[in-house]
Design a protein with these regions (language model features):
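Hydrophobic anchor at the start of a short beta-strand
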Residues: 33, 86, 147
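A donor-sugar binding/catalytic signature common to diverse glycosyltransferases
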Residues: 117-166
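Short catalytic/ligand-binding loop motif for oxyanion handling, primarily in non-cytosolic enzymes
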Residues: 42-46, 95-98, 137-139, 156-160
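Surface-exposed alpha-helical segments enriched in charged/polar residues
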Residues: 73-77, 81, 120-123, 220, ...
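Short hydrophobic beta-strand segments
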Residues: 29-46, 52
Length: 279
């Protein structure tokens, strides 16, 4: 995508409409905006349940991807303190994003959400923080916006082709010894490509979300890179090389090709703080 131009553009009237809607939401026209796309089960439970999907009524196999919005308050408020407006996106969500900071806006629940504004916000945001729920697609795919993926699972399906992207995965805990799996163990235990909750359960793995601090760290890395204030440490290049050397380009179980050119960076602070994970 980074090699092709953006083809979706707004008319002058649409831009005027978008600016007017921003004002209603309480956001200045030239504000810096970060979108927050955090998955829970509400969308499939409520929106899809109302549709005629005869082939599937039970969506719980997706539950391994669920995330707690409370873990995103810290990063939202820190970004707000830095001058960013943070908008929590979503058509249907389980619980509100609770913050007293007026620059942290629970757009999914403020009765001002529209399909048009979803796309308009995607076009003007600085970057997206996403759990890989699909809500990031307009910003990332249509407008080539940078994205920070957190709690991303399955790790072998990271969107490595997206330039200016960062990622960290959930912690994989063994139910046998209650220890966290290393990256190599995630791959060798065949859970790196699990796409159903049952798959993790059958392989004796429980997923634990990234901490608010881990989420904040990788988001700050994005901010610093976008503002040309990022200072890498001498160890970073080695850690990235080690991670991507371990990361398979094909699915271990059947050789299916998953990745081509790697354009993504794994969270630098996460790797610095968890060097054991790469052993």
């Amino acid at each position: 995508m980074s090699k092709t131009p953006i083809n979706l553009k707004f008319t002058k009237d649409e831009i005027k409409k978008g600016c007017a809607e921003l004002k209603k939401i309480g956001i200045p026209e030239e504000a810096k905006i970060v979108l927050l796309c955090v998955r829970d089960s509400a969308y499939l439970d409520n929106i899809h349940k109302s549709m005629d999907y005869n082939y599937r009524k039970d969506w719980t196999y997706h539950n391994y991807r669920d995330c707690n919005i409370d873990n995103f308050v810290l990063v939202s408020e820190q970004l707000a303190e830095m001058g960013y407006y943070v908008l929590r996106m979503g058509v249907a969500v389980k619980k509100p994003l609770e913050s007293n900071n007026p620059m942290v806006i629970d757009y999914a629940n403020n009765d001002m959400r529209t399909d048009f504004m979803d796309i308009y916000l995607a076009s003007i945001c600085e970057f997206v923080i996403s759990t890989g729920n699909g809500g990031d697609a307009p910003a990332v795919a249509c407008f080539r916006k940078p994205c920070v993926y957190v709690n991303y699972c399955p790790i072998l399906y990271l969107f490595t082709f997206i330039s200016n992207s960062l990622a960290i995965t959930k912690h994989h805990i063994s139910t046998i010894n209650n220890k966290e799996l290393t990256f190599k163990e995630i791959i060798s235990n065949n859970v790196g490509a699990c796409m159903q909750s049952e798959c993790f359960e059958q392989n004796g793995v429980v997923l634990i979300e990234n901490t608010p601090e881990e989420i904040c760290d990788v988001a700050m890395e994005m901010v610093e890179k976008l503002t040309d204030s990022w200072t890498p440490m001498s160890i970073d290049s080695m850690l990235q090389s080690t991670f991507w050397d371990i990361f398979p380009n094909t699915k271990p179980i059947n050789g299916e090709v998953l990745h081509g050119e790697i354009r993504m960076t794994y969270g630098s602070n996460f790797l610095r703080n968890n060097t054991w994970w790469l052993k």
